[in-house]
Regions:
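A short, conserved alpha-helix within the catalytic core of class I
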Residues: 121-133
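Conserved catalytic loop of SAM-dependent methyltransferase domains
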Residues: 53-54, 185-233, 249-253
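Short, glycine-/aromatic-enriched active-site segment of Class I SAM-dependent methyltransferases
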Residues: 8-11, 145-165, 169-174
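Conserved N-terminal segment of class I S-adenosyl-L-methionine
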Residues: 1-107, 111, 115, 125-128, ...
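A SAM-dependent methyltransferase catalytic signature shared across enzymes that methylate proteins
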Residues: 173-187, 235
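A short His-aromatic
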Residues: 116, 120
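Short glycine-dipeptide loop
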Residues: 136-143
Length: 263
């Protein structure tokens, strides 16, 4: 979860179905890379990790991986509080890449995740370029980026979350190409959420600032959470398959996976 939302309550036990479904979608999309890193006692970076919930969950499936979470919005005791909350020796949290370099010299990441983070950065190219030039990734590093889809859906929620933009498959693909990253696969997912957001933007949206979002205040029962998570997961899989078949079903999110091209 983004730190803007997470700081309202780090210790929530109930996670929003979108978070659960996105976790399982990442496990599906990145299973080969995660398995490879696990077999080699590798390192995986989550750049813009927020409350680090996702990589903490991933570590339960892949215990041999050292997960590194970096977020420039960590403040005060945030890192200490999260380490105490998760009690996970596979989780390494830092405010910057430089802080990571100080603790771990000459480490190359098997994979780098940027999950719903680059939309928060005014200069997305410079942000990813800094990672490329950091000597922590190379041509063998797999890169996975997820972002919110369709600028036409930009709403008060995006303003609240401090988003600069939303993306399409084409704009995300061009970002990769401009940075010398070869796109292996990209797709939209979460069609049902796209439909509901389209309706919201068209008929209900206002610029009223929100104190929190559905992610931060989710408090439904385990049954309801599991049910909606299951529906969203089916939705995501249908969207991924349809895009592979060239059907082009839209979604509220879009991802691209690739690696640095030979130079």
């Amino acid at each position: 979860m983004d730190l803007i939302e997470a700081k309202q309550n780090f210790e929530r036990s109930s996670r929003h179905p979108w978070e659960n479904a996105r976790l399982k979608t990442i496990l599906h999309l990145f299973s080969r890379e995660l398995e490879h890193a696990n077999n080699e006692d590798g390192y995986i970076l989550d750049l813009g990790c927020g409350d680090a919930w996702l990589i903490n969950q991933l570590s339960q499936f892949y215990p041999n991986i050292q997960f590194v979470g970096i977020d420039i919005f960590f403040e005060g005791d945030d890192i200490k509080d999260l380490k105490e909350l998760y009690q996970n020796s596979s989780l390494n949290l830092f405010k910057t890449l430089d802080n990571f370099h100080t603790a771990f010299e000459e480490i190359r990441f098997h994979a780098a995740l940027m999950l719903d983070v680059v939309e928060h950065v005014e200069d997305d190219r410079a942000f990813i370029q800094e990672l490329i030039e950091s000597n922590t990734i190379d041509r063998d590093t797999k890169i996975l980026v997820t972002v919110p889809a369709y600028q036409s859906l930009f709403s008060s929620h995006d303003h609240y979350m401090k988003h600069f933009r939303r993306y399409t498959r084409n704009t995300l693909g061009r970002l990769f190409m401009d940075l010398g990253i070869t796109v292996e696969r990209s797709s939209y997912f979460f069609f049902s959420l796209w439909l509901s957001r389209w309706f919201f933007v068209k008929f209900m949206d206002s610029e009223t600032t929100k104190e929190n979002t559905a992610l931060a205040k989710w408090d439904k029962s385990r049954f309801i959470t599991s049910l909606i998570t299951g529906v969203l997961l089916i939705d995501a899989k249908i969207g991924l398959l349809s895009n592979r078949l060239g059907l082009g079903i839209p979604g509220l999110s879009v991802f691209a996976k690739g690696q640095l091209a030979d130079r």
